[in-house]
Amino acid sequence: MEKVKLKEIFNNIYELKSDDGLKRIATKSLVPSKRIYGEKLITGEDNLEYRIWNPNRSKLGAAIVNGLKTMPIKKGSKVLYLGVSAGTTPSHVADITENSPVYSVEFAPRIMREFLDVSKDRKNLIPILGDATNPVEYSNVVEEVDVIFEDVAQPKQAEILVNNAKWFLKEGGYGMISIKARSVDVLRNPKEIFEEQKQILIEGGFEIVDEVNIEPFEKDHILFVGIWNKQ
């Protein structure tokens, strides 16, 4: 297999050198030879295996490709992930944090069953069947974390992040949230919704330090990154 030249752009996140001008990113495989969503596996010049991170299947991946400047998830980070779905993005987050826990909350039992297939090989993914709007449900499982990542398609997306931060996020920790405008209101201008959600985050205790629109990968979506200042 041809060895690929990689450049580390964030801790444990790599960009592939390509001739076509397209930005491609990858994470080092925590579980070699194991695909999660049909992603391509490559070998780096260090003879280690890497997984291509498809931005069409991951809002965090899309934000990185679109120029995210602040990426607080790194090796050793303790992460609370709200809305893990079938586990595409959490699997890459688990690659990044290596042995540190990724507390993985999902509300739908059917989807959680799919996620269990992902987590069985990645021991740092801790599956939690729970409701992100009610953090007390999993307060006996989740410890204080460095980062909360939220991808929950509900009207009160920003409030969910603030409430979970009050329970679990350390002082000076980071919140990352993918805002889906159409989940808040299908009729209003997405830009108005983004600004409204941003203000809720600020009033709740976050200092917004980065924001990235993730089109064309996801329509009417933005990703905010904020530093938590406990009230």
UniProtKB/Swiss-Prot annotation:
What's any GO biological process attached to this entry? tRNA processing
Keyword Repeat, does the record have it?
no
Question: Per its UniProt record, what Gene3D superfamilies does this chain match?
Answer: Phosphorylase Kinase, domain 1 (3.30.200.20), Vaccinia Virus protein VP39 (3.40.50.150)
Record's keyword annotation contains Amino-acid biosynthesis = no
Subunit (UniProt): Interacts with nop5. Component of box C/D small ribonucleoprotein (sRNP) particles that contain rpl7ae, FlpA and nop5, plus a guide RNA.
InterPro entries, per database record = Fibrillarin (IPR000692), Fibrillarin_CS (IPR020813), SAM-dependent_MTases_sf (IPR029063)
Q: What class of enzyme is it?
A: transferase
- Positions the record marks as coiled coil are none
Q: What is its EC number?
A: 2.1.1.-
Source species of the chain: Methanococcus aeolicus (strain ATCC BAA-1280 / DSM 17508 / OCM 812 / Nankai-3)
Could you tell me which SUPFAM superfamilies the record lists for this protein?
Answer: S-adenosyl-L-methionine-dependent methyltransferases
Question: What would be an example GO MF term here?
Answer: rRNA methyltransferase activity
Membership in a protein family: Belongs to the methyltransferase superfamily. Fibrillarin family.
Q: Entry's PANTHER family?
A: FIBRILLARIN, RRNA 2-O-METHYLTRANSFERASE FIBRILLARIN
Question: Keywords for this entry?
Answer: Methyltransferase, RNA-binding, rRNA processing, Transferase, tRNA processing
Q: What does this protein do?
A: Involved in pre-rRNA and tRNA processing. Utilizes the methyl donor S-adenosyl-L-methionine to catalyze the site-specific 2'-hydroxyl methylation of ribose moieties in rRNA and tRNA. Site specificity is provided by a guide RNA that base pairs with the substrate. Methylation occurs at a characteristic distance from the sequence involved in base pairing with the guide RNA.
Q: What is this protein called?
A: Fibrillarin-like rRNA/tRNA 2'-O-methyltransferase
So where does S-adenosyl-L-methionine get bound? 88-89, 106-107, 131-132, 151-154
